[in-house]
Amino acid sequence: MDKIEIRGGKRLTGEVRISGAKNAALPLLASSILVDGAMTFTNVPDLVDVRSIKMLLRDLGAGCEEGEGTVLIDGSGIHKIEAAYELVRKMRASILVLGPLVARFGHARVSLPGGCAIGARPVDMHLKGLKALGATITIENGYIEAKADRLKGNEIYFDIPTVTGTENLMMAATLAKGTTVLRNCAREPEITALANALNLMGARVTGAGTAVIRINGVDGLSPATIHVIPDRIEAGTFMVAAAATGGDVLVTGCEPENMGGIINKLRQTGALVEIIDHGVKVSGGKSILSTDIKTLPYPGFPTDMQAQFMVLMAISQGNSVIHETIFENRFMHVNELQRMGADISISGGNYAMVRGVNALSGAEVMASDLRASASLVIAGLVARGVTTIHRVYHIDRGYEALEKKFSALGADIKRVK
């Protein structure tokens, strides 16, 4: 099994270009199910999760052609309505095919999903929403089955904002009869990107990016060419790494307007952050200042950046409190950072008390999930000595060529068997 080996202490300098966003690409590719024709997607990242959803679409009968960063999905050949366990078990985002399948074909059978083990992340709100649109739902033998002659518009309220729930029901409602109003929606940029794509396909979606989304159903959608937006979490990861190593890095191909929570918090740590056209320049400050962090739904500080910022706080001057409000069980990286000398304690399950230390030391560590693995890479970059990260398949789920990009910035990092 692959490992990543890092010799720390190198200052990162240079320019890095950000890939397309995994969390945008997955729902966009799933939306191709809604169309009886060929969709073209550009700026698609080459990630394990993206490969998984392409494999799932192929299994349903869709045609799939790939080029450099480009994917063509032809939904005209879809003849299956079942997303099998073997294809769904590794990735929670597979649930995103449920809404499009039942909307277009009136029937869907999708295995309960897998993915990162960072909390329950139940699909209850997806199912309640589909029921409100007129689908009958049964769960049996580990599969969700949804049936409807044709979905009918309705008003749906989310108990808490849910990104995939908002996306799933927004896609389903595009082909429903009448108007659907989704309330207390998640507001992430990836949701806005999906709504924009659906509208290019002929849907009538308004309000994406706000708490209330309105969808006027149409009889059918048409093929379109869709560009995947940049990955704000990948951009944030490189920005934190630049600050942590005292480096000077230009992060290009990103959208700073979607990264306010990350940029503001990074500035509070003393880093110099300059916003340019389609990019951000980050320079490490004279010292790393401690700051408290509370994860929140967008536009607040993203939970997907919590682990990376914890490394920065671990080597800061002072103490900080990190409050995780989005997912339970998302401090699994703490034990590994402690192995490297970090002074961190957990309180109540969702608070981390971080006391800054002068330096971390290299160690053998184990990645537990996607963002935890990114935090261990940053820790390895700043640590004295050699850090070896095991179970790096987590990294490949959400970061495209991570070690190559860091190497180009001057890091001593390599993948080994």
UniProtKB/Swiss-Prot annotation:
Example GO BP: peptidoglycan biosynthetic process
Catalytic activity annotation: phosphoenolpyruvate + UDP-N-acetyl-alpha-D-glucosamine = UDP-N-acetyl-3-O-(1-carboxyvinyl)-alpha-D-glucosamine + phosphate
Listed Pfam families: EPSP_synthase (PF00275)
Cell location: Cytoplasm
This protein's UniProt keywords: Cell cycle, Cell division, Cell shape, Cell wall biogenesis/degradation, Cytoplasm, Peptidoglycan synthesis, Pyruvate, Transferase
InterPro entries linked to this entry: Enolpyruvate_Tfrase_dom, Enolpyruvate_Tfrase_sf, MurA_subfamily, RNA3'P_cycl/enolpyr_Trfase_a/b, UDP_GlcNAc_COvinyl_MurA
Enzyme's top EC category: transferase
Pathway membership, UniProt: Cell wall biogenesis; peptidoglycan biosynthesis
GO molecular function, one term: UDP-N-acetylglucosamine 1-carboxyvinyltransferase activity
Residues the entry annotates as binding UDP-N-acetyl-alpha-D-glucosamine: R92, D304, I326
Active site: C116 (proton donor)
Positions carrying 2-(S-cysteinyl)pyruvic acid O-phosphothioketal: C116
Binding site for phosphoenolpyruvate: K22, N23
EC assignment: 2.5.1.7
A single cellular component GO annotation: cytoplasm
Role: Cell wall formation. Adds enolpyruvyl to UDP-N-acetylglucosamine.
HAMAP family noted in UniProt: MurA
Family listed: Belongs to the EPSP synthase family. MurA subfamily.
UniProt-recorded name of the protein: UDP-N-acetylglucosamine 1-carboxyvinyltransferase
Gene that encodes it: murA
